[in-house]
């Protein structure tokens, strides 16, 4: 029986920490901000018309009241439709921007695996058990090849993202 060598890697860590992912996150944040501003303006329009409706409905004829109610319902429907469309567009943009980053990580792992004669590489976080003596952990080597700073971790990234979110919240 042929002895197959295997490797394992923390793919999630590599994808999240690779420097190119920072650019992806920035582009997505900018798009999200623009989207929320657009939706906010639409919601404000709805709120204004709803308040006007509440204040003036008693003075309107039934025909005008029905017309204004229909207009409100159309604005609400347009808002909900745009909300769904924007969400889909953001997801598509995320997939499009992340694809080359994920491909780069996969190619890097594949090159490292081939160089070490590994038959296959597992995603470390998806395995119930890995005996380190039996396999090769490629995460550290891949981090170096992908120019991920040694001190950058998922925890430090999470803290960085939370700090950014809090700073953005404070500006609102």
Spans of features found by a protein language model:
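Amphipathic, charged alpha-helical segments and their helix-to-coil junctions
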Residues: 1-172
């Amino acid at each position: 029986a042929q002895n197959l060598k295997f490797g394992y890697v923390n793919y999630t860590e590599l994808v999240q920490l690779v420097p190119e992912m920072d650019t992806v996150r920035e582009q997505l944040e900018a798009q999200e901000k623009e989207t929320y501003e657009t939706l906010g303006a639409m919601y404000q329009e709805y709120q204004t018309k709803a308040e006007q409706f509440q204040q003036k409905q008693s003075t309107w004829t039934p025909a005008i009241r029905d017309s204004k109610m229909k207009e409100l319902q159309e604005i609400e429907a347009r808002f909900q439709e745009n909300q769904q469309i924007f969400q889909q567009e953001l997801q598509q943009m995320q997939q499009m921007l992340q694809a080359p980053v994920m491909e780069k990580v996969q190619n890097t792992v594949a090159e490292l695996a081939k160089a070490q004669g590994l038959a296959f590489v597992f995603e470390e976080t998806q395995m119930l058990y890995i005996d380190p003596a039996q396999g090769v952990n490629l995460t550290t080597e891949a981090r170096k090849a992908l120019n991920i700073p040694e001190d950058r971790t998922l925890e430090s990234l999470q803290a960085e993202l939370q700090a950014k979110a809090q700073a953005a919240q404070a500006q609102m």
